[in-house]
């Protein structure tokens, strides 16, 4: 039975005044964050704590995933000065851990991998003590693009599977096996580089399917995992098929750790970069 009303544990309030200063800084540096673009429910909490996931390569995606709130249309050319601005923000905010992600840019020959590498290099120069986590697209499975990201030596490299294979029709242009291969290629190129992936729950998946995905992730060397509740950004997006209670998320965390994951964040409001610094502490 599909639940259409949000339960009481999903009533987090967003307080714009709590993160006005952070938004001013980002605006001054002409930077985007996935927190803003995806209307993340954790934005007040994270911005108040001076945590953000920077969105490079613009804020327009070339794919049409039916669950995502990032703008979809023909993207503009990316700004080559973006890595320097991101590095300046990381330095000014004195971040101990930073997450860098992007929309999918199938229009670019390397999918944007080169700009990821340049951003890592710029942050290393400006803030050498900052741990760098990347959340990359699939680069259409291109080995050279993935290798360019790995060669930049981030501390964590993530790629989200998002959902179970049966539901991949909601991920326009994506392929479950290709996404698994991205994580495998990263691990094969540098086994020391910690890999991470995430799933949204409440899309219609079964528990058996969830744990089959976790088995698949462990098989390709994935170390870190995030599990969170899918919340439809609007009525025009893919509808929520069910709400997972907090105690079930807790159960999934314990079971995933027992399976062999090094660190698991699991809860209704967990997103890929939520409490990201905690993953680095487990490395």
Curated annotation (Swiss-Prot):
Main location: cytoplasm
GO cellular component: cytoplasm
Keyword S-adenosyl-L-methionine in annotation: yes
Entry keyword annotation includes Coiled coil: no
InterPro entries per UniProt: Aldolase_TIM, Elp3/MiaA/NifB-like_rSAM, Lipoyl_synth, rSAM
GO molecular function: 4 iron, 4 sulfur cluster binding; lipoate synthase activity; metal ion binding
Catalytic reaction(s) noted: [[Fe-S] cluster scaffold protein carrying a second [4Fe-4S](2+) cluster] + N(6)-octanoyl-L-lysyl-[protein] + 2 oxidized [2Fe-2S]-[ferredoxin] + 2 S-adenosyl-L-methionine + 4 H(+) = [[Fe-S] cluster scaffold protein] + N(6)-[(R)-dihydrolipoyl]-L-lysyl-[protein] + 4 Fe(3+) + 2 hydrogen sulfide + 2 5'-deoxyadenosine + 2 L-methionine + 2 reduced [2Fe-2S]-[ferredoxin]
Binding site for [4Fe-4S] cluster 1: 35, 40, 46, 273
Alphabetically ordered keywords of this record: 4Fe-4S, Cytoplasm, Iron, Iron-sulfur, Metal-binding, S-adenosyl-L-methionine, Transferase
Enzyme superclass (EC): transferase
Subcellular location: Cytoplasm
Pfam families documented for this protein: Radical_SAM
CC cofactor: [4Fe-4S] cluster
Disulfide feature: none
Pathway in which this enzyme or protein is active: Protein modification; protein lipoylation via endogenous pathway; protein N(6)-(lipoyl)lysine from octanoyl-[acyl-carrier-protein]: step 2/2
SMART domains recorded: Elp3 (SM00729)
Record EC number: 2.8.1.8
Note describing how the cofactor binds: Binds 2 [4Fe-4S] clusters per subunit. One cluster is coordinated with 3 cysteines and an exchangeable S-adenosyl-L-methionine.
UniProt binding sites for [4Fe-4S] cluster 2: 61, 65, 68
Residue ranges of every copy of the Radical SAM core domain listed in the record: 47-262
Family the UniProt entry places it in: Belongs to the radical SAM superfamily. Lipoyl synthase family.
NCBIfam families listed in its UniProt record: lipA, PRK05481.1, PRK12928.1
HAMAP family per the UniProt record, alphabetical: Lipoyl_synth
Name the UniProt record assigns to this protein: Lipoyl synthase
Provenance organism: Geotalea uraniireducens (strain Rf4) (Geobacter uraniireducens)
Taxon lineage: Bacteria, Pseudomonadati, Thermodesulfobacteriota, Desulfuromonadia, Geobacterales
